Amino acid sequence: MASAKAVQLAHSIDPEYKVGSMILAVTIYPLTPNPDDIIEVMELDNEVYLFSDVQALGAYPYYAKRVFEEKGVQLEISDEDREALTHTVDFVSFSYYSSNCAAADHSLGEPTGSNMVPTLKRNPYSKVSEWGWQIDPKGLALHPEPAVQPLPQAPVHCRKRLGCQRHPGAGRPR
């Protein structure tokens, strides 16, 4: 709601202003080819991108009700709120950090230690930095497609980050 009202205010000040949102981009692979793992990835993607979908599309996506019910959230939204949400961002930007895997059976795989999605697993095909971040440049190439399919505008990639140790005078980490 705050995003929609900020967009509305900015556009009322100057219709030429471009207002965007920024999301954390996470490529999530199924841990195995088990169809249940693929469904787990689809459900996690829905949760990860739910709010950027609202900001870019101006309404809650079809799956939001199910996600909220599963989390015990009761969304109270008025007609006035629904109208306000129509003030959508002009672009969605994203910051890609790493990829992960997911499995329907949460006991499988090595946990990543993610504080945002604790059920995520390490990708056994990715190298890992000394800080435990998975190194997966191909994940960046694969990421935008599922996340932005419903969006009316192309995404803007703002940065690629990697958690690693930096040493003064040693130059950029590789």
Feature-to-residue mapping (PLM):
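Active-site region of glycoside hydrolase catalytic domains
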Residues: M1-P173
